UniProtKB/Swiss-Prot annotation:
Its EC number is 1.8.4.11. Has an important function as a repair enzyme for proteins that have been inactivated by oxidation. Catalyzes the reversible oxidation-reduction of methionine sulfoxide in proteins to methionine. May deal with oxidative damage to alpha/beta-type SASP in spores. Keywords: Oxidoreductase. This is Peptide methionine sulfoxide reductase MsrA.
Length: 177
């Protein structure tokens, strides 16, 4: 595997549901659940959920771009969220659950904007694509019990993913992709 590594950061609602899709891909070194985009250093889960820190739940992905390029990460990201929802994601409401792409350099920004435009023009969604594209800010790793939740609590994870409406939405809009 290439020694070249890059970082990608995505907010897609509850971070429990954002780890597995990326974790299972070739060229992904690690996926960390955490918080970004806010004004408080080292926030806790409770603080972020209180909607007072400005952070969003997010995942930070260390990847090998020669194996799994950033463009593919973007494509996979769009397939995990409702990009037309400005109030959160699925059952999770509030600013801490709003979707966003946090770019780490100009190339990522350019690719993110182009992918958003392609999605808007694709006709998959009739409503406008409202997912934010923002400059990456400090990322704070979430508490240990949130890391790889889908592996630690598979039944709870599956109930949540289905019960929140995420699984049905993804199936309806993306099929078996």
């Amino acid at each position: 595997m290439s020694e070249k590594k890059e970082i990608a950061t995505f907010a897609g609602g509850c971070f429990w549901c954002m780890v597995k899709p990326f974790d299972e891909q070739p060229g992904i070194e690690k996926v960390v659940s955490g918080y970004t985009g806010g004004h408080t250093e080292n926030p806790t889960y409770e603080e972020v959920c209180s909607e007072t820190t400005g952070h969003r739940e997010a995942v930070q992905i260390t990847f090998h771009p020669d194996v799994f390029p950033y463009e593919k990460l973007l494509e996979l990201f769009w397939q995990q969220i409702d990009p037309t929802d400005a109030g959160g994601q699925f059952a999770d409401r509030g600013s801490s659950y709003r979707a966003a792409i946090f770019y780490h350099n100009d190339k990522q920004k350019e690719l993110a904007e182009a992918s958003k435009q392609r999605l808007a023009e694709s006709g998959i969604f009739k409503d406008p694509i409202v997912t934010d594209i923002l400059k990456a800010e400090p990322f704070y790793e979430a508490e240990g019990y949130h890391q790889h939740f889908y592996k630690k609590n598979p039944a709870h994870y599956q109930r949540y993913r289905t019960g929140s409406g995420r699984a049905g939405f993804i199936s309806e809009h993306w099929g078996a992709k």
